[in-house]
Amino acid sequence: MPTINQLVRKERKKVIKKSKSPALVKCPQRRGVCTRVYTTTPKKPNSALRKVAKVRLTSGYEVISYIPGEGHNLQEHSIVLVRGGRVKDLPGVKYHIIRGALDTAGVANRKKSRSKYGTKKPKS
């Protein structure tokens, strides 16, 4: 605990909060163009082919984004909307592509958690 005199001489340091998604530059989402769409394998205990895309954002950053859901229609030069949110078993993937926005189609035949995958309500 500092004395009053110590605080007069040197003020307390401000705590700087470091962003977990710096490429979005204080925005909730960012538009971008896919430069490469490919699959990659996850870290040690898991095994799969995870679909990811390299995206050039309007902020000027180039980031690797995860494509959630089963199947997708993305290819090079597709316009996508990117949000924050990392994928724990893919190192370097700190962003998600939003399904059902811009050029990204929603997940087909999805019944539950539809809003997260951009799927319209099925005609009952």
From Swiss-Prot:
One GO-annotated biological process of the protein: translation
Q: Which UniProt keywords apply?
A: Methylation, Ribonucleoprotein, Ribosomal protein, RNA-binding, rRNA-binding, tRNA-binding
The UniProt record lists the keyword Zinc: no
GO CC terms, sorted: small ribosomal subunit
- Keyword tRNA-binding (UniProt): yes
Instruction: Note the InterPro entries from the entry.
Output: NA-bd_OB-fold, Ribosomal_uS12, Ribosomal_uS12_bac
GO terms for MF: rRNA binding; structural constituent of ribosome; tRNA binding
* Residue numbers bearing the 3-methylthioaspartic acid modification: D89
| Family note | Belongs to the universal ribosomal protein uS12 family.
NCBIfam families given for it? rpsL_bact (TIGR00981)
State how it assembles.
Part of the 30S ribosomal subunit. Contacts proteins S8 and S17. May interact with IF1 in the 30S initiation complex.
Q: What role does this protein play?
A: With S4 and S5 plays an important role in translational accuracy.
* Name the record gives this protein: Small ribosomal subunit protein uS12
Q: Which organism is it from?
A: Nitratiruptor sp. (strain SB155-2)
